[in-house]
UniProtKB/Swiss-Prot annotation:
Designated name of the protein: 1-deoxy-D-xylulose 5-phosphate reductoisomerase
Keywords (A to Z) from UniProt: Isoprene biosynthesis, Manganese, Metal-binding, NADP, Oxidoreductase
Similarity comment: family membership: Belongs to the DXR family.
Pfam families: DXP_redisom_C, DXP_reductoisom, DXPR_C
Length: 412
C-alpha cells in the first residue's frame, strides 16, 4: 500500500480487514503520520514499512519500541526510509498487487518501481499516468504488469468494458485503442462550488473549497474537484488508459454522483456503472478483480435517490477544464507541467498565499511558458525536470504578486 495513511490508503486497509481471508498486507509506505503508521503496523503486521521522510524513522522506531508487550505485533517489520526505501517497499517480493494512493507526482517513482518489478497495479494516483504516460506505458508493456484503475470514474469505464469483446484492452490499460468504444462521459459532481455563480467565486474561501458535497477525500483533491481540474486530469488519464481521442471524452455535471461514468458503443448503446459515492467500491474491485465479493455495504435504492440530473459544465466558471484538454492534446511534457503547476498552485492556495481564482491563472501562465520547450517523447529525467521547473515557475509568480502578472525568466 503506497500512501497508507491517506484517504485511499486507510480505506484500502479497511477493506483488507473486512476480508482477512482474501487479502494480506505485506508492505506499507507513508508520509509524516507516524502515529497512524504504528497503529497500522499493529493491525496489519506488514513485512516492510517505508517512510518518505528519513528524519522520521527514529521517531517510528521509538514509538514501536515503546509499545507495551501485549500491544507489540508478532514481528516488527523491516523499516526503510527515503526515496530508495519507498522503491524497495513498492517492489516487495511477496506483494501480488500494489495500490498506488500517494497524492500527486510524489507517487511516480515508487509506482514505476512497482511496475518494473512486474507487480499488478491498482492506480488511484492519477498524476503518475498524467505526468509520465510516455514513460509509464512502455514500462507496463515491458513488464507485463496489469494496471487497474482505482478511482471511481475510470473504474466505472473499466467495469462497463468488462462485458465487451474489448475487455482485454481495458484490462491491460496500456493506451491501446479500444474498437467499438465511441465515446466516454466522465461524470463530475461539480465540486464545492457547483451551485455558486462564477461571480460569487470572488468570495470563495479555503473552508468553502475543501467542503465536498458528496465525497470524502483529501484536501488537495477536494480543491481540484472545486476547480474541476480533477475532472480535467481524469480526461487525460482516460485518454491514456483507454486509447481514446480527446474529442471523444466529455465531462458532464451529475450532482448526485450516482452514475460514476458512462461509455457509448458503436451501436449507440450507452453503458454506465451506478452506486453510492463511496471510494471503497472501486478499490475493492481492483483488489478482487475479476471476481466480485459479497459485501454488507449499503445497497443503491433509486427510489430513495429520487432523480438523476445532468448538465454541461460552465467553461467560464471552470477554466481549468479547458487547460487540461489543451495540455492533453499538446501531449509530451505538457501534462506534466499542467499537473505540477496545479499541485503547486493548490498548495499555495491552501497556505493562503493566493486566491481561489488565481489557481487557473498561474497554471495557464506556466503552460504558456513551457510551449517553446515542449518535448514530445520525454524520458523519466525530462519529466522530473519539467515537474521541478513548473513548481518553481508557480512559486516565483506567487512571489511577484497576484494573478495576471508575467512570469520571470526561469531555469529548471
Amino acid at each position: 500500500m503506497l500512501g497508507s495513511t491517506g484517504s485511499i490508503g486507510t480505506q484500502t486497509l479497511e477493506i483488507a480487514e473486512e476480508f482477512p481471508e482474501r487479502f494480506r498486507v505485506v508492505a506499507l509506505t507513508a508520509g509524516t503520520n507516524v502515529s497512524l503508521v504504528v497503529e497500522q503496523i499493529q493491525r496489519h503486521h506488514p513485512e516492510v514499512v517505508a517512510l518518505a521522510d528519513a528524519s522520521l524513522l527514529p521517531e517510528l522506531k521509538q514509538q514501536l519500541n515503546a509499545l507495551p508487550s501485549e500491544q507489540q505485533p508478532p514481528h516488527l517489520p523491516q523499516l526503510l526510509a527515503g526515496p530508495e526505501g519507498l522503491n524497495v517497499a513498492a517492489s516487495w517480493d511477496s506483494a501480488d498487487l500494489v495500490v498506488s494512493g500517494i497524492v500527486g507526482c510524489a507517487g511516480l517513482l515508487p509506482t514505476l518501481a512497482a511496475i518494473k518489478a512486474g507487480k499488478d497495479l491498482a492506480l488511484a494516483n492519477k498524476e503518475t499516468l498524467i505526468a509520465a504516460a510516455p514513460v509509464v506505458l512502455p514500462e507496463l508493456k515491458r513488464s507485463g504488469s496489469r494496471l487497474l484503475p482505482a478511482d471511481s470514474e475510470h473504474s466505472a469505464i473499466f467495469q462497463c468494458l468488462q462485458g465487451t469483446p474489448w475487455a482485454e484492452n481495458a484490462r491491460l490499460s496500456t493506451g491501446v485503442p479500444t474498437p467499438g468504444l465511441r465515446h466516454i462521459q466522465l461524470t463530475a459532481s461539480g465540486g464545492a462550488f457547483r451551485d455558486w455563480s462564477a461571480k460569487d467565486l470572488e468570495k470563495a474561501t479555503i473552508a468553502d473549497a475543501t467542503s465536498h458535497p458528496n465525497w470524502s477525500m483529501g484536501r488537495k483533491i477536494t480543491v481540484d474537484s472545486a476547480t474541476l481540474m480533477n475532472k480535467g486530469l481524469e480526461v487525460i488519464e482516460a485518454h491514456y488508459l483507454f486509447g481514446i481521442d480527446y474529442n471523444q471524452i466529455e465531462i458532464v455535471i451529475h450532482p448526485q454522483s450516482i452514475i460514476h461514468s458512462m461509455i457509448e458503443l458503436a451501436d449507440s448503446s450507452v453503458l454506465g456503472q451506478l452506486g453510492w459515492p463511496d471510494m471503497k467500491l472501486p478499490i475493492l474491485y481492483c483488489l478482487s478483480w475479476p471476481e466480485r465479493l459479497e459485501t454488507p455495504w449499503r445497497r443503491l435504492n433509486l427510489a430513495e435517490v429520487g432523480e438523476l440530473t445532468f448538465r454541461a459544465p460552465d467553461t467560464k466558471k471552470y477554466p481549468c477544464m479547458k487547460l487540461a484538454y489543451a495540455a492533453g492534446r499538446a501531449g509530451g511534457t505538457m501534462p506534466a507541467v499542467l499537473n505540477a503547476a496545479n499541485e503547486e498552485a493548490v498548495a499555495q492556495f491552501l497556505e493562503e498565499r493566493i486566491h481561489f481564482l488565481d489557481i487557473p491563472e498561474v497554471i495557464e501562465a506556466a503552460c504558456e511558458r513551457h510551449k517553446p520547450d515542449l518535448q514530445t517523447q520525454p524520458q523519466l529525467d525530462d519529466v522530473l525536470a519539467v515537474d521541478a521547473w513548473a513548481r518553481k515557475a508557480v512559486q516565483e509568480q506567487v512571489k511577484r504578486g497576484t494573478r495576471r502578472l508575467p512570469l520571470p525568466a526561469l531555469t529548471a
